[in-house]
Amino acid sequence: MPIFNPDNVLLSDARTGAVPSAHGTLITQQVIENSKIMQLGKIIEMTDNAGNPVMEKEFTYLAEGPGAYWVGEAEPIETSKAKWLEAKIVAKKLGVIIPVSREFLHYSVAGFFSEIQPLIAEAFYKKFDEAGILNVDNPFEVSIEQSVAAAATGVEGDINYDNILAVEDKLIENGFEANAFISTVQNTTALRNAVKTENGVATPIYDRSSKSIDGLPTVNLKSAEMEKGVLYAGDFNYLYYGIPYTLNYQVSEEATLTTITDGEGKAINLFEREMIALRATMDLGLMIANDKAFAKLAPVAEP
């Protein structure tokens, strides 16, 4: 039986299946490199004991480390236990639909994915971050936004020196320390102006060269759903994600895309416009181990 070679098979002859391994790996790498959740969180290998991928995975995490004791000569050393807790991460299927020209049907499968893989990756990581951070169109039971609400760790006010410290203090009060911030590029001006002046000496809390807030790494979430004036702080050691399965795809020529519209707001009919649509799917898991590990600064809500 001939071996499938994506370099030699036209997309028109292979309209469904797994994304070719090399391109699937590149897409996954691009998602990992650009997703803010994946940049800051910890990955969980979502496989069973035999190494097979699973959509749900139970795991343990270190909630409290072992203690240490002063010991005199000839005295027994006390036994100290670390505190480990059980958690479960659940994956959901994420699909993206990308309409492209019919000419791509004459590309090889490999050539097609070489052209389109950046678009697929961007669609995946934007959607995953919006769900896991902002709780927008979220299939998971958790998100950073939900954690802030559950733990009551929100601070209302403008982005300034004192309010940023107040957000960090919300975590400190619960026994956590922030190790990163999530911001948006729209906050840059406010962050540059977040300065404390004492005795004529101005101390900025934002470092423009390293793009850090209070010495902590800061990433900008590129999303229209991320409001100007919002900052998230957290101990991202309590944020977990998983990628259990390889990517799959399907090509359609006749569908009407109701979730994608043209410049006039009309649904796109592929047949009428001589287009095709790629539907790619990726399984992603998300877990937040402690709501109190996250806090948020947001503008005062309008009455």
Residue ranges and their predicted role:
Residues 65-67, 95, 104, 126, ...:
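Short loop/turn segments at secondary-structure transitions that flank enzyme active sites
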Residues 96-174, 296-303:
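Alpha-helical scaffold segments that mediate packing/assembly in large oligomeric complexes
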Residues 53, 81, 92, 175-177, ...:
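A short, structural micro-pattern
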Residues 1-25, 42-43, 266-303:
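Protruding loop/beta-arch "assembly-hinge" segments enriched in small, turn-prone residues
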Residues 49, 60-63, 101, 184-186, ...:
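Structured loops at beta-to-helix junctions and adjacent beta-edge loops in soluble globular domains
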Residues 154-271, 276, 282:
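Extended oligomerization regions of viral-like shell subunits
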